[in-house]
Amino acid sequence: MPHSQKSRHCELEQGLQAPKEAQGLVGVQVAEAEKVNTTASSSPSTLIQGTLEKVSASGTPGTPQSSQRVCSPCTTIKATPWNQSDESSRSQEKKDPGASQALMLEKKVDELVKFLSVKYTTKQPITEAEMLKGVIKEHKDHFPPIFMQAHECMEIVFGTDMKEVDPISHSCVLLKSLDLTYDRRLSDDQGMPKTGLLILTFGVILMEANCASEEKIWEVLNIIRVYAGWKDFIYGEPRKLITRDLVQEKYLECCQVSNSDPPRYKFPWGPRAHAETTKMKVLEFFSRVSGSDASSFPLLYEEALRDEKEKAQAIIATMGGTTLMASAHSWAKSSSFSCPE
């Protein structure tokens, strides 16, 4: 895997002109996706919180521009060849010996992300022993922070969850987040999972009152350096992915804005999105990443609760019978937090 996920934490100072809690919702994943482009020494909490404060509410999808950047571990996965990176690292170590450990941690995070990506694409289990032996090696004392950052990268950028399958051997597998079944992995993009982009798009739509304009989606994606018409190492050609593939897969719907000339489009969730996940699960995903809970976003939380109740009522109406009343109630209760006072 090339070396440039590091540039994706960079234009974070821009942000979204949206309600404060909605900024926090999408800012969480944008910050993490950008962190697949910043420094290993940066703490997740400082990089996640409060990163999206204002993005111009007007305008059309942006194009790449040069700007000053701060950059981090997972982020470096896409840009610089390893030999160039190593030469730069050695030069930096000579100038600042204190930076050597941070550079080592950053490199090990990138190596572990590459290792985990191969395991995901080949559907092989992962053990702590092989991570230590094959990747971490003599840096075993630093395994916990390296593993934490690599896991965070896989979760946010690639949209994967790690599930333990054998507590004795510490064996785990990587699965797609939020119970999504989308698995479009093409040979020309090395089979990288695209669930992370799908989840981020769901978050933007939820933030935008359940229907996001194409311009708003690109505003957010441009922040993490995903541009319409620019092939991305992870996501392929993103305009095609969003406006055609995800629409064909029924994760999104594409609706032309009335009386728009030239035509403009907006995107709500599609029927497959509603069938496979819920607003509450999307909200909980972003909340977990930010180190908070869903009730930290009260307006979105209340909307997600209503969505849970409506789905429970639909089960009752469809299936009928008093015995299903209790199971539907239990399902709604187990998949959401208790309502705050």
Swiss-Prot record:
Pfam families: MAGE, MAGE_N. Residues 87-97 have a biased composition (Basic and acidic residues). This is Putative MAGE domain-containing protein MAGEA13P. One of its GO terms (cellular component) is nucleus. Residues 1-21, 78-101 are annotated as: Disordered. Residues 105-304 form the MAGE domain. One of its GO terms (biological process) is negative regulation of transcription by RNA polymerase II. PROSITE patterns: MAGE.
